[in-house]
């Protein structure tokens, strides 16, 4: 797909360090190109997806993964929500998905800020690196860069965490971490 439909991103794809980064980048590229919905395999739908399509009015839709985060990369910009990437919807060629892709290509979060995040976060440095380069911290930074225009955030709450708003439940937060080996997809 990348070689034939979006060859300008192939070099970025093959140089991502971890397989999970390649998977993240691939899903953004496919959704940008075709439009549609991405759901991790552990997302249980509570309503038919038609409801999402009718409610979004050509907006991108992403979940708020958590409120009141402490990652200084984000909080220093007066923003405290973490936007998840385990489920999202976008019409084709949406500029917010393009913002995410561009931020991956140019490594929007600097290596210095990644090192600071690795020192502050309790997760292993390799996982924090993924959060900052293709995962939720990168998506959140992209949202801050882009602004709220045409992006609908579906909130969760303390009583019902890990929700894709009213659409679904994300059951296994961080399940990718179990087998996070530095293999690449070619």
Mark where each language-model region is:
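Small-residue hinge/turn detector
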Residues: 24-36
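Glycosyltransferase-associated regions of secretory-pathway enzymes
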Residues: 1-23, 39-186
């Amino acid at each position: 797909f990348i070689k034939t439909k979006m060859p300008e991103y192939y070099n970025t794809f093959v140089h991502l360090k971890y397989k999970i980064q390649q998977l993240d980048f691939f899903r953004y590229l496919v959704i940008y190109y075709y439009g549609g919905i991405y759901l991790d395999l552990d997302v249980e739908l509570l309503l038919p997806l038609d409801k999402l399509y009718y409610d979004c009015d050509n907006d991108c839709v992403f979940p708020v993964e958590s409120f009141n985060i402490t990652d200084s990369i984000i909080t220093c910009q007066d923003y405290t929500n973490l936007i998840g990437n385990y489920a999202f919807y976008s019409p084709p060629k949406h500029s917010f998905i393009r913002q995410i892709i561009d931020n991956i290509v140019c490594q929007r979060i600097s290596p210095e800020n990644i090192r600071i995040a690795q020192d502050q976060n309790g997760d292993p440095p390799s996982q924090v690196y993924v959060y900052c380069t293709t995962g939720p911290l990168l998506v959140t930074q992209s949202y801050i860069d882009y602004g709220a225009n045409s992006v609908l955030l579906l909130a969760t709450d303390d009583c019902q965490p890990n929700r894709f708003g009213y659409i679904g439940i994300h059951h296994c937060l961080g399940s990718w971490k179990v087998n996070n080996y530095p293999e690449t997809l070619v």
